Amino acid sequence: MRAKNQPLLTNFDLIIFDFDGTIADSLRSYRELDQQLIKGLYRVWEEIDEIIEFRDKIKNKSRSDSDDEYYLALDRKYGDGKRPLSEIYAKVSEIFPLIRSKVKPKPGVVQVIKKLKEKYNCKIGMATSSERREINFFSSDDSLIGREINLNEYFDRIVTLDDVKMPKPDPEVYQQLISFYAVPPEKVLVFEDSLLGVTAARTAGTTVIAIEDAHNTRDLDQIRNLADFSITGWKELVF
């Protein structure tokens, strides 16, 4: 963490939010998905902490937002390693709607987004590794998040996984927003929670405030060192 004081929000013309782990308190819910997946495919009940540790180990090796390697590793650990990815993803698709309906916004984030929209003369964007259909779901009244804030209405522009060739940690998702608004990177502030996301935002030349998440503790020191500033929750943000 390089800055001792939080950057002034008035210094920026474009403010960009990540989604999972930054707006959505989703990371533990997605590990519950893995728990149900393992139970459904392999008849094994695994503790969530064990799943998180295993996922971190696999994701740390691949350093990619793709889940292919992780699901193949799950099949090697709990099965015979021969199950087709298509079958695994079919089970994920079956379980996912039940899990995502439980995802809540992170405490204080809805108030932050609404306050930025009302108080500051800047554009607000989202740069996410989620698919467009997921953002549409979380903008709807079918989700706990959508009942508090319609993301599609509050955000001026949303760039999703569908819009980029290279996911985070590649900076493309941020560069698209910067290019669209023709804003110098030094006038862009990003809120991120993950090492992949912070890396992408820093590579794009932006200022980064890290939102620490309990499920990214493995990378916490690196996140703090790479980000310009770090907070443990949205209620710490100074307006």
Locations of regions flagged by a protein language model:
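Asp-based, Mg2+/Mn2+-dependent phosphohydrolase catalytic module
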Residues: 1-12, 114, 131-239
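N-terminal helical cap/lid subdomain that shapes the substrate entry/recognition surface
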Residues: 2-111, 120
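Conserved phosphate-coupling serine/threonine residues in phosphotransfer and NTP-handling enzymes
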Residues: 22, 128-130
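Conserved SAM-binding loop
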Residues: 23, 105, 124, 166, ...
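Conserved ATPase "switch" residues in P-loop NTPase domains
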Residues: 117
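Glycine-centered short loops/turns at secondary-structure junctions
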Residues: 120-121, 205
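A structural preference for short, pocket-lining loop segments at secondary-structure junctions
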Residues: 122-124, 128
